[in-house]
Amino acid sequence: MQQQSLRVLSIVLALTAGISCRELLADDGLLPPVTAPIVNGIKVPDGFHVELYADDDLAHDIHSMTIDSKGRVVVSGPGYVRILIDSDNDGRADSFKQFADKPDTGSQGMFFLGSSLLCSGDQGLQIFRDDNQDDIADGPPQVFLKISAGGEHHVHSIQKGPDGWWYVMAGNFAGVTAAYATVPTSPIKQPVSGTLLRLKPDLSGGEIVSDGFRNAYDFTFNGTGDFFTYDSDDERDISLPWYLPTQVFHVLPLSNAGYVTTGLKRPGSYPDMPPVLATFGRGSPTGVTCYRHNQFPEPYRNALFMLDWTLGRILAVPLTQEGSGWKKDGVVFGEGQDQFGFAPTDIEVAPDGSVFVSVGGRGTRGSVFRIVWDAAQLPTVSSDGDSTTRQIDTVLDAPQPNSSWSRAEWIPLAKSLGAAPFQQAASMEKRPASQRMRAIEILVEVYGGLDRATASKLSLAGSGLVRARTAWAVGRSRPEAPDTEILKKLVSDRDPFVQRFALEALSSATSAASFTTTISSIAAALASNDRSVRFSAALLVSRMNDDHRNALAKALANNLRGLMWFHMGRCLRSPLQSVPSAAVALSVLTSKDASAEDRYDAVRILQMTLGDVGPAKNRPVMFDGYAPALSLASIERELNPIMTKVAAVFPSGDAHLDHELIRLIAMTRPFNRDLFSRLLTSITDSTLPADDIHRLAAISQFEIERSYDESVATAQALLGIDIKIRKY
C-alpha cells in the first residue's frame, strides 16, 4: 500500500513538473522508452505523435501487416513474411526473423492462430505451420481455399470473427462464384463482384455473407459485432454521373454494396443499399481496424480507422449509435505532409494501445510507423473481488479481442474457467454492457452458443445492446434453425437496434419454420420508421418460400410503405418484372402525402419492379445505368399508363428525385416528345457536366426522330461538356 501511495504521489509530482505519463509508463516497462525517431512528415491531431518503428532496410514494399500471438509486428511483401524484432526494447525494430520466403506475390492479409499463419497469396488462402515454434515456417504452405490471389483486386484480408468463424474479404476479380457457398446456411448463393466470405472454424466449408463490393481491401468488427469496410472508387469515372467516391460501409448480412459494372454503381442513397457511414472522395482503400483499446482518448475509442494509399491518409469514423445503426461521420485523422512519401497499406492496434501503420505497395519504400497518444493513462488493475472474479474481468475486458495477440491471452483463461461464470456475467445487470456482450460472444465461440434458458433470460435484459447481442448469439448458435420464439420477440423489440440484429439472425436460416413463426414480426419490421430495420427485413424475403411471401403481402395490405419495401425485397436476389408490384411503388411516388424520402425510395423501387437497369449483351457499358436489364416487351401495354403518371411528376423540383426519375424515364424508352424536350431544355450553361451527361445518356434512349433544332441542341450540349469540365 505504501509503495502504491508513493507511486501515485510520484505521478502527481511528475505531471506537475511536465513529465508525461508515457515516460512513467516507460520507466515501469509498460511502454517502450521514447528513443524511436519522431516522424514529422505525417500530420496527426494535437496530442499525438508518430514514431518510426522500422524502415525499408528491414522490410521493403510492405503489402500487409499483422501482430502475432506474441505481440510482435509481422509484415509481408513479395517473397517474404518477416517478424520484426525490437531486441533492446527501445521502441524501434533493429532486426527481423524470416518466417517464410513466400508468398511470391506477397500477402494482402495475415492472421496468426497460435504459431501458425493463415494468409492470402500465390494460389489462394494458405496456412504456414510452425509446430516447433521456432518462428520459422516448418515447410511450404498448405492451400486451404483456392481463390485468385496476389493481384490488387484479388483475395485480401482474413480475420477471426467474434463467433470463432473465419471472415475473408475478396475483391471483384477474385473469382468468387456460387461454388464458394458450400454450406446450406450461406446467406448468398449467387455472388456478384467483391465478397465477404465466412468460413467454418475448421475451414471445412464456407458461406458468402455480403457482396457487391468493388475492391474492399480490409474490414473490421466493432464492439457490437457489426462489420465495416472501406470500398474503392473508380477514379477513371471522376467526371461522369456514375462515379462514386470511396465509401465506408456498414455491412449487413445478405446485402449487396452496389458495384455491378464499370458503368453501373448504385449510390448509397438507394433503399436497396447498405448504410454508407462516410465518403472520402478519390482514393485507394487499404487497411481497416476498429480501435477497441484504451490508450487513445475519446472520440477515437471504438472508432473505425481506415487507410487511403493514393492520397496518403489515415481516416477515422467515430461510431455513435443512431437508431438501428450508426451516425454518418468521418474525419481525416492523419496524412503525409511536406512531400513526405506516405503510402499506407495496413493498420493494427498494438498490445499497448498504440497503433502501427505500414507503408509500401507497387514496389515502393517499406516502413512501419507507430502512432502514440502523448498523455497515455496508466493501466488500472482492479483489486476488488477474488481471484476468479479478477480472471473473469480480465477475459471480458481484453482489448482488441479478435486479434491474434489478445486471443492468445484470453482464450486459455476462458477455457479454464468454464461456461458457468460467463453465463452468470452475461446475466448480471450491474455489469457494463460491454462486458455482458463479450460474455455472450465467449459463450458462442468457446462453449457452442447460448442454451435456451440463458437466451430467454437475456432477451429481457435492460440493456438494448445486450438484447441485440443475444439476438446475434441465437442466430450464430444454430444458424440453420435459430430459436424463433426468442427471435420473434426480439424482432418486435422496442429498440430498433435490437430489431435489426434479430432480423440478421435469420439471414442464415434454412428451416421454413423459422419464417413461419416470425412472419408477423417481419411484416411489422417492413413498415418500421427505421430505414435499416426495413432494409434488414426486406433482405430476408429472398430466403422465403411463396407461402411466406404471400403471408407477408397479406399482412401489409393496408400499409403502402411496408408493402413497397416487401416488393423491393422480392427483387433483391432475382430479377422481377411485375406490374402489380410497380403499381404499389407508383402509388407512393404520386402520393401528395408521401415524404420526400418515401418518394425517392419509390422511384428506385419502381425501376427494380420493372426489371431494373443493367448490362446487356452488345450494349456499351456506359448505358448500363440507363437501359433496361430485361426486355419490356411483355409489359408494354401495362407500362404506358404507368409512364404517363411518371411523366406528370417530372420535373418534381427535387433534384435528388429528378435524377432517378430521369433514369426511370430512360430505361422505359418512351415515345414521348414532350419528355424528350423537357430533358433537352434542362441542359443549360449553368448545369454541371456530370448532370449534362446524365441527361444526354437518358435522351439517347428515346426512340423518337429528332428535329434539326433538337439535333443541334444535343450536339451543342455534348460539345459544352469539355468546356464545363475545364471551367469547373
How does the language model describe each region?
Residues A419, R452, D483-T484, F515-I519, ...:
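Core helices of alpha-solenoid repeat scaffolds
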Residues L24-W405, E409:
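Beta-propeller domains with acidic blade repeats across secreted/periplasmic ectodomains
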Residues V613-L639:
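HEAT/armadillo-like alpha-solenoid scaffolds in large eukaryotic assembly and transport factors
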Residues K430-P432, G462-S463, R494-D495, N529-D530, ...:
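Short inter-helical turns and helix N-cap capping residues of alpha-solenoid HEAT/ARM repeat scaffolds
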Residues L9-S20:
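Bacterial N-terminal signal peptides
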Residues L630-D654:
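Alpha-solenoid helical repeat scaffolds
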Residues F144, A216, P421-A425, T454-S456, ...:
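Buried hydrophobic core positions in alpha-solenoid tandem helical repeats
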Residues L396-L417, S434-G448, T454-L460, L465-E480, ...:
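Structural detector for internal amphipathic alpha-helices that build alpha-solenoid repeat scaffolds
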